[in-house]
Structures are given as structure tokens and as C-alpha cells.
């Protein structure tokens, strides 16, 4: 069981996703995660319709980030996002994979905004092969408002790539809003899930044109919505890394570190009946 004098007694290690705090500067996010008592943190250095952040190749930023991670005894779960868009280049993905290796991340996320599947698969294979050489993989995040709208589309990319280091992200909001049902998690294909991002949400989905707003700005803390999170947690493998991605309007006026702390408090209370199943090993950056 996990025991830390600052973080308390809790067997499930939890990461803080950048979107939970509405994407603050990365070094600030590390500080907030550490002060709030998280075990891990994510770095978001790539977004749709934007160039990869120059921080991904900045040696001074890497040095400062590593120092903060060590100070707060934090691991890095994910680096995001490799963005599959028609005009993207291999090097834009490579620099994120390189950063992930240097910072000690276990996951490199990818999103798909290109409806030419053959082109996506070709680029995915090239980046997966490069990542494998660094002992990393690529995890595809499906979103109902992207060109990879649900698990079936993401799994098609996994299968087409024929690469063992290509996986799928289970985001509980996107799982629900894309039409996912619990029985889907019993399919053998569900073994391709390698990472879970938790949030809650209202029972009624917004209109299709509002799905992105809900995803980026209006999720709910665990237990405050209608998603069957408990049933999901009972079905998923216990070796999946777990991160909180919960941008929430109710908490947005609190100082960012207090938002982080409150999300963690609520999450631990909600997850307590399931947390004993997790024995996740995520080593801090040295």
C-alpha cells in the first residue's frame, strides 16, 4: 500500500492532467500538483491548430521541470499531444517523444484531426517505430468531436498500425459521449486501453456542437455527475495509470492550487472503495 507523510495513506496513485486547471504554464502545474499532494502530473505541449511548444526542445525548461519533479517527488504520466493533422510533420511528433523520454513520461498521447486514415496510419507507424526505440508507446485519445470519434475508430488505428506499442486512452467523458457502454469493456479489444482519465459528467449529453466545450471547460468532479464510474473501475485492469482530467466551472474561481487540492480530495473520497485494486508503480524522475 502506498504511504507518504505528505500524501497520506492511499493505494491508488493519481495524476493531475493539465486540462483540470485549464492548462496553466507547465512548471506552475508541477508546483500545483506537488503542493496539492498528487503522485504524478502531465505535460501538454502540443494542441490542435497550434505548433508544438518550443518548451519541448528547451534544455533549460527540461532542467527546471526535472528539478521541480524531484522536489515534489512527482512522476510524469503523460506528454500530450501528438496531433495528426494533414500538414503535420514527423519531426513535430518526434520532438514530443524525445521530451517524453527525457522527462521520464510513461505515455505519449495522440489526437486525430485528419480524415485520411491511410495517411494517419502511415504517420502513426513511423512515430510508433521511433517511440519503440526509446521504449515508449503512443496512446490514441478518441473524442466524439474529432476525426477519431470513438473506441472502434481508435482500435482500427491500433490494428492497422500492427504495432504493439500503440494503445488507446480511456477517458470516461469521451467513453460516455461517444456511445460507449459497459459491455464494451468486456470485449477482448478493450485490452488495448493503456491509460484512464477520470471525470464525471451530467446525465444528458450536450448538443453535438457543444461536446467540445463540455470536454474542455465543463466536466464534473467524481461522484457529482451521472457516469457509472464505479462500474468502469471494476472492469478496467488495475495496472492502468489513472489521471484526473476535470476542468470544472464550479471550482474555477478558486486559486489553481486549491482547485487541484479539492479535486484530489473529492477523487480520493469517491475512489476509496475501488482504490485497493490498484498497485501502480510509477517511479519519480531522478
Model-derived regions, located:
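Active-site beta-loop-alpha junctions enriched in small/polar residues
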Residues: 17-21, 44-48, 81-84, 111-115, ...
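Short, well-structured secondary-structure segments
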Residues: 39-46, 75-80, 106-109
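Glycine-rich, proline-tolerant flexible connector loops at the mouths of alpha/beta enzymes
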Residues: 42-66
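Alpha-helix N-cap and loop-to-helix initiation/capping positions
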Residues: 53-61, 88-95, 115-122, 146-149, ...
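Catalytic-core regions built around general acid/base machinery
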Residues: 58-71, 123-133, 184-185, 231-235
Amino acid at each position: 500500500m502506498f504511504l507518504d507523510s505528505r500524501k497520506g495513506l492511499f493505494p491508488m496513485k493519481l495524476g493531475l492532467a493539465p486540462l483540470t486547471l485549464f492548462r496553466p504554464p507547465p512548471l506552475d502545474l508541477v508546483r500545483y500538483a506537488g503542493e496539492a499532494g498528487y503522485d504524478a502530473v502531465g505535460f501538454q505541449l502540443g494542441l490542435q491548430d497550434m505548433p508544438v511548444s518550443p518548451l519541448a526542445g528547451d534544455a533549460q525548461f527540461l532542467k527546471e521541470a526535472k528539478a521541480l519533479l524531484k522536489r515534489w517527488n512527482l512522476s510524469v504520466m503523460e506528454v500530450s499531444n501528438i496531433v495528426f493533422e494533414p500538414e503535420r510533420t514527423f519531426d513535430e511528433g518526434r520532438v514530443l517523444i524525445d521530451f517524453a523520454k527525457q522527462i521520464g513520461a510513461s505515455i505519449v498521447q495522440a489526437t486525430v484531426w485528419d480524415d485520411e486514415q491511410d495517411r494517419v496510419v502511415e504517420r502513426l507507424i513511423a512515430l510508433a517505430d521511433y517511440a519503440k526505440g526509446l521504449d515508449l508507446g503512443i496512446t490514441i485519445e478518441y473524442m466524439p468531436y474529432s476525426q477519431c470519434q470513438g473506441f472502434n475508430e481508435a482500435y482500427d488505428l491500433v490494428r492497422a498500425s500492427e504495432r504493439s506499442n500503440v494503445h488507446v486512452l480511456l477517458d470516461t467523458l469521451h467513453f460516455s459521449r461517444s456511445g460507449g457502454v459497459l459491455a464494451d469493456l468486456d470485449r477482448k479489444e478493450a485490452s488495448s486501453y493503456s491509460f484512464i482519465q477520470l471525470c464525471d459528467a451530467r446525465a444528458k449529453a450536450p448538443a453535438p456542437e457543444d461536446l467540445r466545450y463540455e470536454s474542455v471547460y465543463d466536466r464534473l468532479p467524481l461522484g457529482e455527475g451521472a457516469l457509472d464510474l464505479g462500474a468502469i473501475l471494476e472492469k478496467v485492469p488495475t495496472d492502468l495509470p489513472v489521471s484526473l482530467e476535470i476542468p470544472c466551472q464550479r471550482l474555477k474561481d478558486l486559486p489553481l492550487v486549491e482547485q487541484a487540492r479539492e479535486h484530489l480530495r473529492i477523487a480520493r473520497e469517491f475512489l476509496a472503495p475501488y482504490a485497493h485494486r490498484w498497485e501502480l508503480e510509477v517511479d519519480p524522475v531522478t
